A protein has these predicted regions:
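Beta-propeller domains
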Residues: 1-21, 51-63
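Beta-sheet-dominated scaffold domains
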Residues: 24-187
Length: 187
């Protein structure tokens, strides 16, 4: 992170509370950071794993108290921003084949990343973008839209653009509902 009130100053110095934070993610492989999300904790998504910086009692993260913990070893797809939904974080797996929900587990005192598209992964074809529309009343859940790529030939073939196919997921965690469908447009 940068120095307080100096957003482009990432130079580490005396490790004062308002100094920049420099942390190395200790893993057995090189992992490029794909996204950051601030929620219950600071979540760090990489190509090979997910990490989090725990934040106890709403104390700010500083150079003297920063700790990075490993959450899961799934990896997230580059270019698709994770979405916050009902206390969890939805993200696409690094291969673009599974929609996962990163959720804190009180039993494990860490995050788990469950595959919520297990029964409908065939609807996700080369995902290009994701967007979430939160539910607006008590009779509907959150709606996650995943824009698929151009190629529908073969099993998840690589593509270069958008052909008009969208995978839609209605999510309602309290009722344990994940309802998936597809929308087709003219492109």
């Amino acid at each position: 992170g940068s120095k307080v009130t100096d957003f482009f100053n990432f130079k580490a110095s005396e490790a004062l509370d308002d100094d920049a934070i420099k942390v190395t993610l200790s893993t057995d492989s090189v992992n490029a950071i794909t996204a950051l999300r601030s929620g219950r904790d600071l979540q760090i998504f990489t190509t090979g794993a997910e990490f989090f910086v725990p934040q106890a009692d709403l104390t700010p993260i500083t150079p003297s108290n920063v700790t990075v913990k490993s959450a899961t070893r799934r990896g997230s797809k580059l270019g698709l921003r994770p979405q916050a939904a009902e206390g969890g974080t939805l993200f696409m797996s690094k291969e673009g084949k599974a929609l996962r929900e990163m959720l804190f587990s009180d039993v494990e005192l860490s995050y788990v990343a469950n595959n919520i598209s297990l029964l409908c992964s065939h609807m996700i074809l080369d995902p290009q973008r994701m967007a979430l529309r939160p539910g607006t009343d008590t009779t509907e859940g959150d709606l996650l839209l995943v824009v698929n790529g151009t190629s529908t030939t073969g099993y998840r073939a690589a593509s270069t653009g958008f052909a008009g196919n969208i995978a839609a997921f209605m999510l309602n965690r309290p009722q344990q509902i994940v309802a998936a469908s597809t929308f087709s447009t003219d492109g």
